[in-house]
Each structure stands twice: as structure tokens, then as C-alpha cells.
Amino acid sequence: MTGVQTCALPISGHACTSRGVLGIGVPQATAIADAAGARIRHLDETGVYVHVIADGGMRTGGDVAKAIACGADAVMIGSPLAAAYEAPGRGYHWGMATFHPTLPRGARVKAGNRATLAEILVGPAHENDGTLNLFGALRTSMATTGYETLKEFQKAEVMIAPALQTEGKSLQRAQGIGMGQ
């Protein structure tokens, strides 16, 4: 495509240890929003649209929705796909960023076998932890916030609220269910 470029934005994947080892890094939402802002400036200056692809730690449909709302055009979901029964890694995910002495592609992380590829992507979900039916979760997030298209959703006003990760989860944690696992 003329006038379109793609740029992957690696943040910190499931198998990546760089942030912990080096003690540096940029939080996912900030990095995506900054890249999306730079994309707009680049488009204004050159007329070339650069796709932002968020890569790093995408586990749930909520993670995917947040990445899109922050401005990503697409996300990489290595670990969720590796957990599909059909995945060639048989429940393992190989990270690209982390060195490993015997594996040419980085660290090998156990993703487990959770569900079929169809269940992971489009459901039905047989667990309520957000790791199944990723597309359904994205659609529900968009509908709940009043957006009909991905392009509209990319322009959503985003508020960072760390309490959302723990608020109202005490019963789930106590019972080891849902997002409290």
C-alpha cells in the first residue's frame, strides 16, 4: 500500500524480562498513546500513515480493548494464541526478546492449553477471567463506551485508574475465581 507503513511497538511481552532486568521501560498505555500521537504528527508532516501495533502482555480482551482505545491499530497476542489446543507449540510460547542459552528464539514460557483457537478469539467462554472470547470482549467494551468502529474507539478518552484492577475483587480473590485467580 502506498502511503502506509507499519511499526511494531514492543512494550514488554509475556516472556520478556528486559524491564525487570534493566529497571527501565514505559507503561503500555503511555507508550501506545505516545506512538499514536507521533503517528499523527508523522502523517501531518509526510502524508504517510504509520500503523501502531501494540505488543506486550496482552492476556485478556480488556487488555486488547485498552490498547485499541489508547490508539493501537492492532495488537500482538502471542501467549493467548499459544494456549490454543491447535497451537504448534503445544502449550508453550517462545518470547522473541529474551535470550535463552538453548532456545534460538528467547525464553520458553508455559502458556498451557486452555481452549480451542475459536474459543479464545470468538467464544463461547467457559471461564470468566477475560482470557476467552477476546473479540467479544472488545465488542462489548466498545458498545459499553458508545463506540461503533475501531477508528472511533481509537480516539476514546482514556482515564488511568489503578483501582479498577482490585476494586470489588475481594470475593473473587477469596474464592479463586474470575479475575481474582
Language model segments and positions:
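Alpha/beta catalytic cores of nucleotide-metabolism and tRNA/nucleoside-modifying enzymes
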Residues: 1, 22-54, 59-181
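Short, small-residue-biased leader/transition segments that mark boundaries at the very start
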Residues: 2-9
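Gly-rich Lys/Arg/Thr-decorated short loops/hinges at beta-loop-alpha junctions or inter-strand turns
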Residues: 10-20
